[in-house]
Amino acid sequence: MQDSLTLNPIARVDGTLNLPGSKSVSNRALLLAAQANGTTRLTNLLDSDDVRHMLTALGQLGVNYRLSADRRSCEIDGLGGPLRADEALTLFLGNAGTAMRPLAAALCLQAQDVTLTGEPRMKERPIGHLVDALRQGGAQIDYLEHEHYPPLRLRGGYQGGDITVDGSVSSQFLTALLMMAPLAPQNSCIRIKGELVSRPYIDITLALMKSFGIEVRHDNYQVFYLTGGSVYRSPGEYLVEGDASSASYFLAAAAIRGGTVRVTGIGRHSVQGDIRFADVLESMGATIRWGNDYIECSRASLHTIDMDMNHIPDAAMTIATTALFASGGTTTLRNIANWRVKETDRLTAMATELRKVGATVIEGEDYLTVTPSARLSAARIGTYNDHRMAMCFALVALSDTPVTILDPQCTHKTFPDFFARLSALSTPASPHSAP
């Protein structure tokens, strides 16, 4: 296994990149297809650790699927109803929140004991608000180690009814409830307590459910109404959009060291909120062009911003490293407390690693300020087993300074060939070229 990867200075990035499938869309689509009536063919499926964990779990639960040799398309024979285990079993889900949370809800509709567990970091990622909500609907759930955290033992029992869920930590809790509730015996009315974070991810969920035949009524995202005893219906074919979070690194690279980069597989009508990252780059000075199936970014002089980033929590990390190249002082990212419950505590991790390359950083409870130095320092960047840390800090090589990424394999969670794709668009700086 490769312990580290040193990226030498990059003079220019240019070209077109066809994005890998979206992680958020891939795992939602797999779960809905598995429970739908009929066979679904998913294309442009993401091949990554998170998706492999979901596929393995579905296979253990008796779902039949046929995966293409390149793992980018998959035919799933739907069960025509809720997931079910024939006997007690344990599902290992790695650090895949997009598998853990929805499966925890989905498996409350069947009677066998099912244990959900994962990597050590998964056992540090809170799930208590989801468990509380499921218990309100009758689910029997036990914590096997620490209260409010995986591993969990699920023993069915969810009926429906009036449910209140805290929306302030993770939108994945609401996503999990929304996707399972139509299959419950009774109607569900789901009320949101607190501010709903990452609302665009709920839009992804609602769009996917609609593609599988179920429309959800809601009162301005505060109360959701779901009819129990419903059936998901396969759309036959479903094209997984390119991953908008993954697009952010290449669009930012173009803004810093373009040329022009075009990312294809997403566009102006994407269901993913992270396409709004392009608007943030534009507000920093970059030139953005939109098509139905692409977003294009060209280099411009970048300046600082002060902005609420709650709507694009994953892509906002890319803004933190893009800020190293912005003129005019300090960039401030606000309302990002949910960074702390991701693959690592991303606020602390980002602050720590930005300081290594010479930035002055203030880490607040829910905000980050970044003031770049005149010249970046060469550094060895810790990645905390977090794919997005590795990909964000690759942008440091767009300076006249090399950067070393520790544990580069962590990108396999969502983008296994990220570094090869970046290299293919890059022109290396010659040893004597100006920055």
From Swiss-Prot:
Pathway stated in the Swiss-Prot or TrEMBL entry? Metabolic intermediate biosynthesis; chorismate biosynthesis; chorismate from D-erythrose 4-phosphate and phosphoenolpyruvate: step 6/7
The molecular function terms of the Gene Ontology recorded here are: 3-phosphoshikimate 1-carboxyvinyltransferase activity
Q: Which SUPFAM superfamilies match?
A: EPT/RTPC-like (SSF55205)
Q: Which residues bind phosphoenolpyruvate?
A: 23, 97, 125, 172, 346, 388, 413
- Keywords annotated in UniProt: Amino-acid biosynthesis, Aromatic amino acid biosynthesis, Cytoplasm, Transferase
Residues involved in 3-phosphoshikimate binding: 23-24, 28, 170-172, 198, 314, 338, 342
What PROSITE patterns is this protein classified in?
EPSP_SYNTHASE_1, EPSP_SYNTHASE_2
Amino-acid biosynthesis found in the keyword field: yes
What InterPro entries does the record point to? Answer: Enolpyruvate_Tfrase_dom, Enolpyruvate_Tfrase_sf, EPSP_synthase, EPSP_synthase_CS, RNA3'P_cycl/enolpyr_Trfase_a/b
EC class of this enzyme?
A: transferase
Give the record's GO biological process terms: amino acid biosynthetic process; aromatic amino acid family biosynthetic process; chorismate biosynthetic process
Signal peptide (from-to)? none
Q: Where is the active site?
A: 314
**Reactions it catalyzes:** 3-phosphoshikimate + phosphoenolpyruvate = 5-O-(1-carboxyvinyl)-3-phosphoshikimate + phosphate
Q: Which domain of life is it from?
A: Bacteria
The record's subcellular locations are: Cytoplasm
Family from the record: Belongs to the EPSP synthase family.
The record's note on quaternary structure and interaction partners says: Monomer.
Q: What does this protein do?
A: Catalyzes the transfer of the enolpyruvyl moiety of phosphoenolpyruvate (PEP) to the 5-hydroxyl of shikimate-3-phosphate (S3P) to produce enolpyruvyl shikimate-3-phosphate and inorganic phosphate.
User: Could you tell me what this protein is called?
Assistant: 3-phosphoshikimate 1-carboxyvinyltransferase
